[in-house]
A protein has these predicted regions:
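Domain-level signal for soluble alpha/beta catalytic cores
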Residues: 1-189
């Protein structure tokens, strides 16, 4: 399967892609040595066969025992889910190699509720303080495919009362939250 995957990546590269994201929530599971070795080998093969910059995205939980594996994969950036597991930030900051970018999943892509901006900004600023702004990306915890598209389209008061609606954020609003966090934290990306 890997050679076919690399063919697809090369086609993207030929079309002008510079970055790709590989979602790997599997890294949040309990893995044995054989599974860890397979992941390392797969990413090594991809790295050897493409010049694309790669971000590996983990989500739905923390990296736990797979943190060392994840930070040492041959990729340019690592994405972690801080909405689900904010306590992993300190340990990741302490072991992240100096050449890696860290993407912080601070806006929850799994629910319809507004973000705690203060908490998210605190996490972003902690990472920026340790890594520098040029090595910190601000992102959703995972894809926003789990939430409805746009709260502005919910116009019927009887279906969604204003008192509840004001606490909600759908995908469009979550993108606005990301922009606000980026601006308020002064993040480069």
């Amino acid at each position: 399967v890997l050679p076919v995957y690399v063919e697809l990546l090369k086609a993207l590269e030929e079309k002008g892609a510079e970055w790709i994201q590989i979602d790997e929530p599997y890294l949040a599971l309990d893995l044995d040595d054989e599974q860890r070795n397979a992941i390392q080998k797969a990413f090594g093969y991809i790295r050897e066969n493409t010049r694309l910059k790669i971000i590996v995205a983990t989500y739905f939980d923390g990296l736990k025992d797979n943190a060392d594996l994840a930070v040492n994969l041959p990729v340019e950036a690592l994405h972690i889910d801080l909405a689900r597991c904010p306590e992993q930030l300190d340990s990741i900051l302490n072991i992240l190699p100096a050449d890696k970018i860290l993407s912080l999943g601070v806006v929850d892509g799994r629910n319809i509720w507004k973000n705690d901006l203060e908490k998210s900004i605190e996490l972003v600023n902690k990472a920026k303080g340790k890594l520098g702004a040029d090595r910190v990306f601000v992102a959703g915890s995972c894809s926003f495919l789990h939430v409805p598209y746009d709260l502005a389209l919910e116009t019927k008061e009887q279906n969604l009362p204003a008192g509840i609606k004001r606490w909600m954020a759908f995908a469009a609003q979550k993108i606005e939250e990301l922009a606000a966090i980026k601006a308020l934290a002064g993040s480069e990306t």
